[in-house]
């Protein structure tokens, strides 16, 4: 009888210990609330770190493109790669003006538009450009932070292959004139060769820039240095 009572006491004591080790509903809610607070504190920091990493990668892409652009000039008598908005096909573009590399197909730094046809998601247009042989990768033509698709606002859109554009005053194929809305266009500085970078100097002139997905079209970004409010194309934010 005493042995039986002892066993009952042991079982009762064990059940009490098991019950004592459990969490109450309030304790579980407190733990969940703490986890939620910690997540809310960490997520902005993680998002900021991701944005910073994307910015660093984008700057690296611009640097590589600029080096490829400089190499092109070095191989072509210091003439800058033609820059413009010629026909939207990888082949058949000609630039016969003496200021450009005369003749030859695909005579511009990067053909194709990001707002029409198949070129927004076809990297063969990038590969047909004059700078590509010096960089040999299409990835650097696109900023990792750019999540835009074409056609925009659709469920079947595809990521654009390019978000980078070139300064429109660096050996433009299209001739600027006053009728296009550029104030004092004839007096604006157009750079044809590396030796033209005198005023302003190279450190005051940008070559490539990440363009806003709402305005990106051809591969050059159009702006008027004489008018602060005249930006047909807008840099990415």
Task: Set out the residue ranges of the language-model regions.
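Compositionally biased regions
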Residues: 7, 13-15, 48, 164, ...
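Short amphipathic alpha-helical "recognition" segments used for binding
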Residues: 6, 12-15, 31, 54-56, ...
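Short, well-structured segments within or immediately adjacent to enzyme catalytic domains
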Residues: 58-237
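Compositionally biased amphipathic helical and low-complexity segments enriched in hydrophobic
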Residues: 5, 12, 26-30, 44, ...
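Amphipathic alpha-helical segments typified by the pilin-like N-terminal helix
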Residues: 18-60
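N-terminal leader/signal peptides at the extreme start of proteins
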Residues: 1-25
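Generic hydrophobic-segment detector
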Residues: 12, 26, 30, 39, ...
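Coiled-coil-like amphipathic alpha-helices with heptad-repeat character
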Residues: 10-12, 47, 137, 157
């Amino acid at each position: 009888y005493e042995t039986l009572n002892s066993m009952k006491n042991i079982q009762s004591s064990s059940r009490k210990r098991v019950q004592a080790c459990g969490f109450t509903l309030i304790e579980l809610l407190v733990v969940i609330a703490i986890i939620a607070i910690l997540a809310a504190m960490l997520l902005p920091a993680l998002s900021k770190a991701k944005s910073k990493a994307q910015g660093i990668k984008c700057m690296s892409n611009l640097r590589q493109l600029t080096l490829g652009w400089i190499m092109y000039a070095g191989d072509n008598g210091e003439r800058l790669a033609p820059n413009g908005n010629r026909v939207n096909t990888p082949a058949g573009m000609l630039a016969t003006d003496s200021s450009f590399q005369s003749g030859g197909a695909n005579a511009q730094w990067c053909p194709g538009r990001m707002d029409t046809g198949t070129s927004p998601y076809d990297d063969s247009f990038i590969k047909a450009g004059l700078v590509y042989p010096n960089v040999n990768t299409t990835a650097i033509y696109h900023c990792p932070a750019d999540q835009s698709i074409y056609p925009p606002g659709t469920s079947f859109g595809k990521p654009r292959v390019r978000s980078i554009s070139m300064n429109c005053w660096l050996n433009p194929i299209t001739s600027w004139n006053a009728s296009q809305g550029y104030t004092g266009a004839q007096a604006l500085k157009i750079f044809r060769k590396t030796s033209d970078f005198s005023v302003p100097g190279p450190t005051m002139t940008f070559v490539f820039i990440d363009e806003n997905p709402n305005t990106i079209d051809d591969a050059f970004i159009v702006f008027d240095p004489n008018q602060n409010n005249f930006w047909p194309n807008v840099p990415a934010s």
